[in-house]
Amino acid sequence: LIKDYNTAGGGKYAEYYTPHAIATIMARLLVGDNADLHSMECYDPSAGTGTLLMALSHQIGEERCTIFSQDISQRSNKMLKLNLLLNGLVSSLDNAIQGDTLVSPYHKSDDGQQLRQFDFVVSNPPFKMDFSDTREKIAAMPARFWAGVPNVPAKKKESMAIYTCFIQHVINSLKKTGKGAIVIPTGFITAKSGIENKILHKIVDDKV
């Protein structure tokens, strides 16, 4: 049901559906066979219907983790909540939020001043999409988007590399001992300049 929704009814977000095999590989890389994990907090800032989070919770153990999510699509968020119900994660239902993560992140620290940080963060964000209507709001938060915010292409607004903002958000949302995994386009790794290169330098220099 979830897969059919993503491939047939997900609208403009459908292309970002994560295949189950990829989600499983990411979860195994993050968690391994560690049986000593308890009270883990897992987060996806572009959760869609929750494929990555479900794989992660299965790898950790549903009874040993709490799920947190946010997604801009109301329809996807409703399907994610169904996914939580079907996978025995009822206690996490209130943590599944519909909204714009980049402009208005919901999950914050207790004092509301900082982003909440998690043990595990996973994401398969939109690689390129028209975010021109919120670009200036995002750019007005340099502390969060320290590597910069991509410009809106003059001719093809939908080719804005918005995924670079999600990478920065993922890094900001990790505990010092946390682990993250994010699906990115292959060109990111070989970037020699721009926002992508700044992010790569931070990952290496700060040993993220």
Predicted regions, residues:
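Conserved Class I SAM-dependent methyltransferase catalytic core
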Residues: 152-208
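A short, mixed-charge helix-start or loop-turn motif at secondary-structure junctions
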Residues: 8-9, 66, 149-153
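Conserved S-adenosyl-L-methionine
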Residues: 12-123, 128-132, 137-139, 184-187, ...
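Conserved catalytic motifs of ABC-family nucleotide-binding domains
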Residues: 140-158
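Long recognition/docking surfaces used for binding and targeting
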Residues: 1-10
